[in-house]
Amino acid sequence: GGSEWPKWKRLNFASKNYVPKNKNWWKDHSDPVNADWPDWAHEQYMAELKSMIDVLHNHPSLIVWTTFNERWGQHRSLEIGQWVEQYDPSRLLNIASGGNFFEVGDVADQHKYPHPYFPLDMPIDDDYIKVVGEFGGHGWPEQGHLWDPEKRNWGYGGLPKTKVAYIERYKESCEILGKLKK
């Protein structure tokens, strides 16, 4: 994750207003620790985040705000996390699902493919809820259920040769996840 340009950068680049400080930066660093967004882009992000929280504030099934996914657009993480905690203290905060972890919020979240994993021996995570936010990605091209049977199908770890092997791989991931819970 994280190799896609943030929405503001794509739109601004398309409008020809964007001039990168270092034209080779994005080629050499597709996953910044904390992207350097200009103030106007950050303000737009915050306006949209506030609007989302305002619209969804009374939905009881929402228990966690997740501000970033896999570093996509992740910027000013501590500032944003502290703002969310103050603006809606009634919910947990996951600053970055599978992205760069910052010591703010309530959740430390890992994405691992194909099988789940969490580095339980890292003291920095001790005070946080540990979550495997994504795992699996096991692929099986079920005939009659493909968008385009002519295109290549995929799955993390490659495609198994049989449906039985696919099911076994899926069960193995679930068993590993169960052991992490213990």
Task: Identify the role of each PLM range.
Residues 1-182:
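Substrate-binding/catalytic cleft of secreted carbohydrate-active enzymes
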